[in-house]
Regions:
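Flexible, low-complexity linker and terminal segments
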Residues: 128-176
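Active-site-proximal loop->helix
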Residues: 31-36, 56-70
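Conserved thiamine diphosphate
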Residues: 62-129
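Single conserved hydrophobic/aromatic residue that forms the stacking wall/gate
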Residues: 1-13
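Alpha-helix C-terminal capping segments
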Residues: 10-14, 35-43, 95
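A short, small-residue-rich loop immediately preceding and capping a beta-strand
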Residues: 14-29, 44-49
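A short, conserved beta-to-alpha structural element at the edge of catalytic cores
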Residues: 41-63
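Short gly/pro/ser/thr-enriched loop/turn and capping motifs at secondary-structure boundaries
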Residues: 26-27, 51-56, 143
Length: 176
C-alpha cells in the first residue's frame, strides 16, 4: 500500500519519493506491491526494516521470522514444515529484471551503521538520477518483542539473522 501511494504522489507532484516499511507490511500484505513496483522499475526507493517479527502489533510471527524463533503466535518457534521458510525479499527482488539496486545492511554495530548510511545514500542517489527501483533492507533488532535486552538483541541479530540473511549488495546495475 505504501508503494501505490508513493507512486501516486511522485506522479502528481513530480517529486522523488521513498517508502519506509517493516517486514510485516512489505513482506506480507504488501508483497504484491513491492514485487510489481520492482517489475515496473518504479523510480521509488524503499527502506525495508526487517526485524523478523510484527513489532508494532504484539510480536506475532512475520514472513521473515526465522525457523525456531519464538513469537506470540509461534510460542514453540517457527516450524518450517508448517509455516514455510522465512522470506528472503532482497534475493527475490534482485532477480527482477527492472530492479536497479538492492542491498541488505544491518544496524547492530557502528561499522554496519556506517555501511547502512552509505547504502541508503546510494539508493537515493540512483533514484534522483531516475535509474529505477531501489531497495535497502535493514536488519534491525526488536528487543521488546524478542524478550531480550538491547545488547542481547544485537548479539542475537549477529548470531541468527545475519547468517540467514547475508549482508551485502544483491544487485547494482550502476556498478555493472
Amino acid at each position: 500500500r505504501d508503494l501505490r501511494m508513493s507512486r501516486g504522489l511522485g506522479d502528481v507532484y513530480k517529486r522523488q519519493v521513498f517508502t519506509y516499511q517493516g517486514d510485516g507490511d512489505l513482506a506480507s500484505i504488501g508483497t504484491a506491491e513491492i514485487v510489481h513496483a520492482a517489475h515496473r522499475g518504479e523510480k521509488i526507493s524503499t527502506i525495508f526494516v526487517n526485524n523478523a517479527i510484527y513489532g508494532m502489533t504484539g510480536g506475532q510471527m512475520a514472513p521473515t521470522t526465522l525457523v525456531g524463533q519464538k513469537t506470540t503466535t509461534s510460542p514453540y518457534g517457527r516450524d518450517e514444515d508448517w509455516c514455510g521458510a522465512p522470506l528472503k525479499v532482497s534475493e527475490m527482488l534482485a532477480e527482477v529484471p527492472c530492479s536497479y539496486y538492492i542491498e541488505r545492511v544491518a544496524v547492530n554495530n557502528t561499522p554496519n551503521i556506517v555501511k547502512a548510511k552509505k547504502a541508503i545514500s546510494k539508493a537515493f542517489h540512483y533514484q534522483m538520477e531516475g535509474k529505477g527501483f531501489t531497495m535497502v533492507e535493514v536488519l534491525s533488532a526488536c528487543p521488546t518483542n524478542w524478550g531480550l535486552s538491547p545488547i542481547k538483541a544485537m548479539e542475537w541479530l549477529e548470531e541468527n539473522m545475519i547468517p540467514y540473511y547475508p549482508l551485502g549488495v544483491k544487485k547494482d546495475k550502476g556498478a555493472e
